[in-house]
Amino acid sequence: NFYVPYYLSTIGGEFQSLTGLYPNYSTLTKWKSGENSFPYGLATTFKEKGYNTYAYHAHDGYFQNRYKYLKALGFDNFKACNMGLNINCNMWPESDIEMIKATTNDYINSDKPFMTYYMTVSGHLDYTKESNSIVSKNWDLVKNLDYSDKAKSYLATQIELDRAMESLLKELENKGILEDTVIVLLADHYPYGLSLEEINELSSYQRDELFEINHNALIIYNSSMKNTNVTKVGMPIDVLPTIYNLFDIKYDSRLFAGSDLLSNNEGMVILDNLSWITDKGKYNSLNGKYSGDIDSDYINNIIQNKIIFSRNMITYDGYRYIKEK
């Protein structure tokens, strides 16, 4: 029951998972400047625990100012196209396989634990052979499937990510550290390069264009872990608190809009139009319809407080002042 609400393309999804806050246009603009302080950010927190931190992106590092805001989050070692990443950057989209193979030696022999962040790109639209190098590369693997060309093209791009992950797992296993590695995998948004009809070709059930189009998955993997399915609803703002809990990192839960998915807190998903889903009901802000066993006004008040908190923490650089005190 993990949802990835669409907020202003990739950067909105990335913002949620890296900060534990709700995005909007003004906060994303401020965040991209790289001027905010994030003493409780992902890389900063793990560095304080003795980890080396790395970040990689298989596209231009200047795009969306990614090199600035990842630095603000504590990533000292960042590579991307035009920023030291040695892959073929003269194609679109670039290859996640090439990114993984070009970077694992940076950290896999580290004398310290490492925390590595990858922003993949091979699954990006458009989903046609003519405009997408990854679709063209993997087309023979999907061409005979009983789907539309757009749906097959989408699958072709995901094969690239799948094989990139295979390469990473093999490298970790060959080094003898796979069992001591945790992998967290999530999306930044639904594939908006496909129509709802094309998405439903690939879905095991019929999705609607408001709630279920955003239904996705969060995978937290360790080779020695027992499989567990978490049924409570969640979204990317919950990922950071969940990771901190799993690594026994102490944090003040009041400093994030999200919450630990493994806690007893009720799950909540908030869409960009303020529709929402909880473990006990859902609300459609477009028509005002509510269904479930919980006070909708109570949930709406919680949502407003979380949104205001998120906006203020970025707009006024709130974490900087909290840390100083």
Tell where the protein language model's regions lie, with residue ranges.
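Solvent-exposed soluble domains appended to multi-pass membrane proteins
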Residues: 1-325
